Amino acid sequence: MTGKERREQLLDVGRALFAERGFEGTSVEEIAHKAGVSKPVVYEHFGGKEGLYAVVVDREMRCLLDMVTGALTGGHPRELLEEAAFALLDYIEQDTDGFRILVRDSPVAQSTGTFASLISDIATQVEDILGMEFKQRGFDAKLAPLYAQALVGMVALTGQWWLDAQKPKKAEVVAHLVNLSWNGLSGLEPRPRLIGHRKN
């Protein structure tokens, strides 16, 4: 086996174990044993479990981000919202192990490669769409980042729930997500106010 093939094998083995057991529940010993190599081979290729995990997470993030970005290629804003929601649920359905890896807590020492940072990247793209929509409606476009985070977070958390529930069907989940977010946006007040007693 070439060095490149061995590296890919270790990535495949590590990915499967991280999806099943998480970062903390996986050891270098297990990775090496499942790959049929000694521990030093894992260290040689990745420097340790953290390095292997970082590469696995980076690949999954790129895959999901590419799917969502590819869905945001033009059209009516509501259609873009539908396509983005479908892209996330498609990824969850097609790459369940990858999604499980992304939503698990990453090691404390790792500053990048978290699900939160991925959601933030996606929200930045949605922000541009919302900013244009806000300008057309006379709303403050500076608030688009807040709404983008809320929308993307709603879809992502629903995706986590759907992964476990596996019902209703994907198209129905997307329809309900879009219904809530789109109709919520269509009734948006330019200057929302609180109606309760608490004001700060």
Specify the residue positions occupied by each region the protein language model found.
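Hydrophobic alpha-helical connector segments
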Residues: V55, T69-Q94, A148-L151, V174
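Helix-turn-helix
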Residues: Q9, V13, L17-G51, V55
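Amphipathic alpha-helical segments used for helix-helix packing
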Residues: Y91-G113, E127-G131, L157-D164
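Short coil/turn segments at alpha/beta junctions that flank glycine-rich nucleotide-binding fingerprints
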Residues: E20-E24, D95, R137
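Amphipathic alpha-helical packing segments from all-alpha helical-bundle domains
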Residues: R62-L65, S111-K135, P145-A150, E172-A175, ...
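N-terminal intrinsically disordered/low-complexity leader segments
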Residues: M1-E5, A141, E189-N200
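Alpha-helical DNA-contacting segments of helix-turn-helix folds
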Residues: G51-E60, M67, L118
